[in-house]
A protein has these predicted regions:
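Extended, histidine- and acidic-residue-enriched regions that form the cofactor-binding/catalytic faces
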Residues: 1-80, 85-93, 97-113, 121-275
Length: 275
C-alpha cells in the first residue's frame, strides 16, 4: 500500500500536490474511489489482500482513462471475519459516513463522476446504496463497479466453482502483485459447510455471476462455514502468477471500459470550479 521507492503516479491522489490536482480536475471530472478491507484471507494470503488488489487495479485503470484515483478507503465491512485475528471492521453507520464525506469532498473539488470501485464482497450492498445517495445528495453522479464484474472475469479465466475468498483467484492475484507476501507453504483447500440452498445456487452462478450476491448476502460468520477462513471449492494451490496477471489485465480493462462507456453516455466533463 505504500512503497517508499515507487515512482510518482500522476493520477494517484496521495502522490500529487494541490496544483497538480487542480490541473487534473480541469481535464477530467472522473474520480475512482476504491474500497478494500482489512480482514483475514486464510493461512497463506495477507490480511490486506482486498485492499492491495483493488488499489492496484484502480490506479492502473485511472492511468488508462486519465482519471483521478483516490486512496483506498479501509477498513470496511468485515464483521463476518471477526473470529480471525487481524480483521478490522467498521459499523455500517461509520462506513456510510466515511464514504459520503469522501465523495462530498471529491465533488466539491470538481470531480462530478465518482466511480466506487469495490474489491470486497462485504461492501457490495452498502456501496450500491451509497452510490445512489452520492448522486442524490452531492453535486456528483456515482456508479458502482463491483463484485459481479470480477466474477465474470473469474469465469472467463475458468476459476473453479465458488471461489470468492482466498481461493484460486485471490491466490493468483497476490502471486502476481505481491508474491513476497504469500505463504505458499501454507496454502490449503478448506473444508466447506455452506447451507444447502446456497449449495444449490452454485449451479446458477456458473451462468450468471451477478447471482453470487444472493449466496453471500447474510453469509454466516466465516468460521462456521470454512475450516481455515478460505471460501472456495477450488484448490488454492492452482493459483499462479500467470493467471494473476491475466485476471489483473482483464479487471483493469473492464474498469477502464466502464468509465469510457459512462463518459460516452453522459457527455463531456463538467468544468471544475474556477475552470
Amino acid at each position: 500500500m505504500c512503497d517508499l521507492n515507487e515512482p510518482k503516479d500522476a493520477h494517484y491522489l496521495p502522490h500529487l500536490t494541490w496544483p497538480e490536482v487542480d490541473a487534473l480536475r480541469r481535464r477530467t471530472d472522473v474520480a475512482i474511489l476504491p474500497f478494500g478491507a482489512i480482514e483475514q484471507h486464510g493461512p497463506a494470503l495477507p490480511i490486506g489482500t482486498d485492499t492491495l488488489g483493488v488499489i492496484a487495479v484502480a490506479r492502473a485503470a485511472s492511468r488508462k482513462v486519465d482519471a483521478l484515483c483516490a486512496p483506498v478507503l479501509f477498513p470496511a465491512l468485515s464483521s463476518h471475519h471477526m473470529q480471525f485475528p487481524g480483521t478490522i471492521t467498521l459499523s455500517e453507520e461509520t462506513f456510510a459516513r466515511v464514504v459520503m464525506d469522501a465523495a462530498s469532498s471529491l465533488a466539491r473539488h470538481g470531480f462530478r463522476r465518482i466511480l466506487l470501485a469495490n474489491g470486497h464482497g462485504g461492501n457490495e450492498a452498502a456501496l450500491a446504496y451509497l452510490a445512489y445517495r452520492i448522486t442524490r445528495e452531492t453535486e456528483a453522479a456515482s456508479l458502482l463497479f463491483g463484485i459481479a464484474e470480477l466474477r465474470k472475469i473469474y469465469l472467463t479465466a475458468e476459476i473453479d466453482k465458488l471461489d470468492i475468498h482466498a481461493g484460486i483467484g485471490e491466490t493468483s492475484s497476490m502471486l502476481y502483485q505481491q508474491p513476497q507476501l504469500v505463504r505458499s507453504e501454507r496454502l490449503e483447500q478448506p473444508k466447506m459447510a455452506l447451507d444447502p440452498w446456497r449449495e444449490a445456487l452454485l449451479r446458477q452462478v456458473r451462468d450468471d455471476p451477478s447471482l453470487l450476491r444472493y449466496i453471500t448476502l447474510g453469509l454466516p460468520p466465516v468460521h462456521e462455514i470454512s475450516s481455515n477462513g478460505c471460501i472456495t471449492y477450488g484448490d488454492p494451490h492452482k493459483g499462479t502468477a500467470a493467471r494473476g496477471r491475466e485476471l489483473f489485465d482483464a479487471y483493469v480493462a473492464a474498469m477502464a471500459e466502464f468509465v469510457e462507456a459512462w463518459r460516452a453516455a453522459t457527455g463531456p466533463a463538467v468544468p471544475a470550479p474556477g475552470g
